[in-house]
């Protein structure tokens, strides 16, 4: 997926991180998994959104890419 395929909010933050105006997190996969886990665990959110977040987190965890 390319940044231009993402929503406006993602593109905005991408630009801010790239310009140095927003902090960069070197362990981005860990950050993503933690965020997806928080979404999946939040029972106030719709079930479909929680299931999608859980699926994405599980796929990241099982992938061979690791933060170093």
From Swiss-Prot:
Coiled coil: none annotated. Transmembrane segments: none annotated. It holds the Pfam family UPF0253. InterPro entries: UPF0253. It comes from the Bacteria. Disulfide bonds: none annotated. NCBIfam families: PRK04964.1. Belongs to the UPF0253 family. This is UPF0253 protein VFMJ11_0680. It comes from Aliivibrio fischeri (strain MJ11) (Vibrio fischeri).
